[in-house]
Amino acid sequence: MDQLERRIEDLEMKLAFQEGTIEELDQQVIKLNDLMAAQQQQLRILITKLQSVEPSNMANQSEESPPPHY
């Protein structure tokens, strides 16, 4: 019976450790999800700002005349 009790205790300890690990991982997932949501919001703001910027008056590089040679 001693061996059975030890095996049960070992399983209980492993289960407790796994529960703690799962809780830690769950908290990390929550933090990463919050971070991702914040980054998505920042990206949406940046896209909106970029879309509202007027195009530059500079010509495209392909439209530019070649520089004078020295």
UniProtKB/Swiss-Prot annotation:
Pfam families: SlyX. Belongs to the SlyX family. It comes from Shewanella sediminis (strain HAW-EB3). The gene is slyX. Signal peptide: none annotated. Coiled coil: none annotated. This is Protein SlyX homolog. InterPro entries: SlyX.
